[in-house]
């Protein structure tokens, strides 16, 4: 959701990534301080998904769900041909904790099919390896002709989930907004 929004920003909007805000001074002109610089802007949307919610703004309304997934190496042309004619695709489960399977633009298959409560933390290496066995079994069941394809990447992330399973967009002050609990499902 946020990536889609970022791609369509008008020329007069600046996007700052990988720049954690460590202090905010609200006002007619908001001042945001990062470890490297200070940013001043009249209007600010903080798209922070989960982390700030856990410790402040909405902690009574949100829980952190830890997800994990695996991504294959780049597929060969012969392997891609076993998948049909679509050049990139994604499948989302109707169930909120269900699997996500994608053929990426760079011709890898990404599978994410574990969602669990892990006390708002990422999975450790041992937990990740155990989850990768689940990913492998699911991958082999869905793509038996590709069961020889190894996973090259393994990841986990914490996603904010609200009780009513929707996102949060909140006005914190007249010109400061917060966006959280967005995961892109159903979009």
Please give the residue ranges for each predicted region.
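Helical element adjacent to the flavin cofactor pocket in flavoenzyme catalytic cores
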Residues: 1-42
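Hydrophobic/aromatic beta-strand patches that form the interior of the parallel beta-sheet core
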Residues: 16, 45, 177-179
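Active-site substrate-recognition segment that forms the wall
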Residues: 21-23, 30, 38-77, 82-174
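Conserved mid-domain beta->alpha element of the FAD-binding
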Residues: 170, 174-187
């Amino acid at each position: 959701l946020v990536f889609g929004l970022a791609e369509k920003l008008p020329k007069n909007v600046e996007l700052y990534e990988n720049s954690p805000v460590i202090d905010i001074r609200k006002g007619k002109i908001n001042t945001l301080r990062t470890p490297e610089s200070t940013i001043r802007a009249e209007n600010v949307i903080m798209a922070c998904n989960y982390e700030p919610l856990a410790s402040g703004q909405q902690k009574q309304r949100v829980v952190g769900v830890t997800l994990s997934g695996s991504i294959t190496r780049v597929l060969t042309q012969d392997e891609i041909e076993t998948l049909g004619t679509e050049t990139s695709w994604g499948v989302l489960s109707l169930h909120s904790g269900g699997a996500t399977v994608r053929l990426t633009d760079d011709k890898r298959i990404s599978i994410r099919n574990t969602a669990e409560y892990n006390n708002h933390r990422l999975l450790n290496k041992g937990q990740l390896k155990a989850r990768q066995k689940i990913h492998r079994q699911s991958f082999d069941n869905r793509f038996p002709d590709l069961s020889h394809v190894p996973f090259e990447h393994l990841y986990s992330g914490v996603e904010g989930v609200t009780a009513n399973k929707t996102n949060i967009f909140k006005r914190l002050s007249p010109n400061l907004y917060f966006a959280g609990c967005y995961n892109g499902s159903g979009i």
